[in-house]
A protein has these predicted regions:
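Second-shell loop/turn segments in exported
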Residues: 14-20, 48-50, 146-152, 180-185, ...
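An alpha-beta-alpha
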Residues: 15-79, 98, 198
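Extracytoplasmic/secreted envelope proteins and their assembly/folding machinery
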Residues: 6, 27-31, 55-58, 62, ...
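Extracellular/periplasmic periplasmic-binding protein-like sensory domains
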Residues: 112-192, 247-248, 252-254
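Extracellular/periplasmic bilobed ligand-binding domains
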Residues: 57-154
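Flexible loop/hinge segments that line or gate small-molecule binding clefts
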Residues: 1-17
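Segments of small-molecule ligand-sensing domains
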Residues: 172-189, 197-252
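Sec-exported extracytoplasmic/periplasmic mature domains
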Residues: 32-40, 62-70, 89-96, 113-120, ...
Length: 255
């Protein structure tokens, strides 16, 4: 697994391993950022009804936020919703200091655009799903504040980034698939690390036999672009760090 952060992914599944951090950790990081950096006392949480990722991460965030003394107002929107004006109005009327919306990218773009159109001045706080060129495009030139947690921040490995950008620019299809620019998203870097982690397991097994590769995976240790990668008994990565980035609305890049 590359960026599947919900704890249930590996629960009771002995054949699944992943290299990303999990949502209980991510929710705590986000809550601490809201409290310490954004000085929030009240947070409006918004996610898709029935979506395990949204609802799970909102729950972990709420638990951590309340331990820090923050108040959380939680609401959900139905699948395929496209109008978030009433939810944004509620957040404003509730006196929220921050909007936390760990949604999928399609909803995220609408939330950013509609928040800007409504003149919502409170920060929009989100998770790894918002770490996308789509969000940068939606926020560029607008008076919005967007913060996201993620697995990698550009500038972390100059050699890798140079090669990756050269690869993107070398082919028009690569460039188009990357949103028409050479910005490196964390999911791309994680995909790179996941590939080489799997390769380490194949090397350790000395064969492509599935059972042998599976037996080798728990002992794999790999130094990737995103850091040290190893697994616990559940098949989850031993991760204890995350990045928080903000969308630069002038340049259209992450700071």
């Amino acid at each position: 697994g590359v960026t599947c952060t919900n704890p249930q992914v590996t629960s009771d599944c002995s054949v699944y391993f992943r290299i990303c951090f999990l949502d209980p950790f991510q929710g705590t990081v986000l809550a601490n950022f809201a409290k310490d950096e954004l000085k929030a006392e009240k947070v409006y949480c918004l996610g898709q009804l029935g979506n395990d990722y949204d609802q799970g991460l909102m729950n972990y965030f709420k638990q951590a936020a309340e331990k820090l003394g923050m108040e959380c107002v939680v609401e959900s929107f139905p699948k395929n919703n496209s109008d978030f004006t009433s939810y944004l109005t509620t957040a404003k009327n509730e006196g929220a200091d921050v909007i936390f919306a760990p949604t999928s990218i399609s909803y995220a773009q609408l939330i950013v655009e509609q928040a800007a159109a409504q003149g919502i001045d409170m920060p929009l706080l989100a998770s790894d799903t918002w770490d996308s060129n789509v969000i940068l495009g939606a926020a560029k030139g607008k008076d919005v504040k967007v913060y996201v947690t993620t697995f990698y921040a550009e500038g972390g490995n100059a050699e890798f980034e140079k090669g990756f950008k050269e690869w993107i620019k070398s082919d028009s299809t690569n460039l188009s698939n990357n949103g028409g620019n050479d910005i490196i998203s964390a999911v791309s870097v994680m995909g790179y690390d996941a590939y080489y982690t799997a390769l380490e397991a194949l090397k350790a097994a000395g064969t492509t036999n599935p059972q042998d590769v599976m037996a080798a995976l728990p002992g794999v240790k790999y130094t990737g672009i995103t850091g040290e990668i190893s697994f616990n008994e559940e098949g989850d990565a031993n991760r204890d760090s995350a990045f928080v980035k903000t969308a630069n609305t002038e340049t259209g890049v992450w700071d």
